[in-house]
């Protein structure tokens, strides 16, 4: 694998640090008037999802992580594992709850997901940026109930709870941003 100096760190770069794969989320290169230049780096552990902030000297280098992202189609959840399929080879992979994490609430049948593999094992699952889900439970919106600018909680078909505008009703399909968990729009 390639080696990267700390001033080469960019968001999205996957590196090996302390024997585990990390993804760089942000990197700020600092060159003080006095002393050696350094980089302040925010990274996410790919195995657990935890975030770490580290400072590296400009001369420090780290190996690139041998991880690869694959576009796979989500098939189903059997209660213990989430099953995905490669559309080119029809090979199936299963990811455990640790790899899926909180993203399980955004997975719908036939959704194109990015599965990150390390040593052939899934370590992270990224759902599509936007999903369309049906509202299965929410409070009814009363006519003239517009005093608050907020919204109301709505339970979606996958079990996720999202704050929606007051005019949205049960049975409607809405578009949700999976990165922030926020309501985007109604789907016509």
Swiss-Prot record:
PTM statement from Swiss-Prot or TrEMBL: May be beta-lysylated on the epsilon-amino group of Lys-34 by the combined action of EpmA and EpmB, and then hydroxylated on the C5 position of the same residue by EpmC (if this protein is present). Lysylation is critical for the stimulatory effect of EF-P on peptide-bond formation. The lysylation moiety may extend toward the peptidyltransferase center and stabilize the terminal 3-CCA end of the tRNA. Hydroxylation of the C5 position on Lys-34 may allow additional potential stabilizing hydrogen-bond interactions with the P-tRNA.
Gene Ontology molecular function, alphabetical: translation elongation factor activity
Pathway where it operates: Protein biosynthesis; polypeptide chain elongation
GO cellular component: cytoplasm
CDD domains in alphabetical order: S1_EF-P_repeat_1, S1_EF-P_repeat_2
Keywords noted in UniProt: Cytoplasm, Elongation factor, Hydroxylation, Protein biosynthesis
Entry's transmembrane regions: none
Main subcellular localisation: cytoplasm
GO biological process: peptide biosynthetic process
Annotated InterPro entries: Elong-fact-P_C, NA-bd_OB-fold, Rib_uL2_dom2, Transl_elong_fac_P/YeiP, Transl_elong_KOW-like, Transl_elong_P/YeiP_cen, Transl_elong_P/YeiP_CS, Transl_elongation_fac_P
Localization in the cell: Cytoplasm
Modified residues (N6-(3,6-diaminohexanoyl)-5-hydroxylysine): 34
Function: Involved in peptide bond synthesis. Alleviates ribosome stalling that occurs when 3 or more consecutive Pro residues or the sequence PPG is present in a protein, possibly by augmenting the peptidyl transferase activity of the ribosome. Modification of Lys-34 is required for alleviation.
Family under the similarity heading: Belongs to the elongation factor P family.
Protein name: Elongation factor P
Gene name of the encoded protein: efp
């Amino acid at each position: 694998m390639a080696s990267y100096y700390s001033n080469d760190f960019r968001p999205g770069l996957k590196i090996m640090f302390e024997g585990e794969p990390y993804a760089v989320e942000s990197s700020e290169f600092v060159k003080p008037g006095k002393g050696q230049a350094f980089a302040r780096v925010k990274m996410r552990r790919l195995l657990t999802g935890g975030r770490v902030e580290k400072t590296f000297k400009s001369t420090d280098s780290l190996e690139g992580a041998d991880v690869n992202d694959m576009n796979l189609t989500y098939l189903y959840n059997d209660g213990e594992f989430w099953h995905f399929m490669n559309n080119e080879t029809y090979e199936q992979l299963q990811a455990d709850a640790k790899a899926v994490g909180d993203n399980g609430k955004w997975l719908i049948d036939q959704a194109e997901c990015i599965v990150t593999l390390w040593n052939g094992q899934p370590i992270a699952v990224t759902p599509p940026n936007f999903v369309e889900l049906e509202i299965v439970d929410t409070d009814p919106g009363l006519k003239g109930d517009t005093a608050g600018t907020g919204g109301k909680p709505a339970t979606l078909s996958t079990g996720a709870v999202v704050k929606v505008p007051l005019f949205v009703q049960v049975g409607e399909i809405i578009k949700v941003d999976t990165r922030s968990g926020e309501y985007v729009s109604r789907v016509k």
